[in-house]
Amino acid sequence: MTGDPGAVVYEVTLEVEAAIADAYRAWLRAHVAQMLALPGFVSARSFSVREPVADGHVAFCVHYVLRDDDALDAYLREHAPQMRADGVARFGTRFRASRRVLRPLD
């Protein structure tokens, strides 16, 4: 992570229809760059998920490292609705997103 005990990981897992996976992946690269420009974001790493996803979808996962809980709370309050709406405007119901927050054990 960052070595900072206050840092948190905001994990976003995306299940995307296989038919739009290439277009979604291209959009996701730009989206991650926009997220990293927001206050409190330190770094991000994107992954493809190895386990198969049911019903013709592929999965991606992004780990965003944020400075601390306050930065995450500010993002969720001030920026998340707009950032999430962009993906929905482009891809509609052709993807699903789930999110969780991870904290270091030590």
Where are each of the predicted segments found?
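Short, low-order "capping/linker" segments at domain edges
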Residues: 102-106
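Beta-strand elements of well-folded, non-transmembrane domains
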Residues: 16-18, 68
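Short, solvent-exposed loop/turn elements at beta->coil junctions and helix N-caps
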Residues: 47-52
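Active-site-flanking beta-strand signature of metal-NTP-handling nucleotidyl enzymes
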Residues: 7-15
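Short amphipathic alpha-helical segments
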Residues: 20-46, 83-85
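An amphipathic, aromatic/His-enriched active-site/gating alpha helix that lines ligand/cofactor pockets
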Residues: 36-42, 55-58, 65-101
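Short, flexible turn/loop "capping" segments at secondary-structure junctions
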Residues: 2-8, 54-56
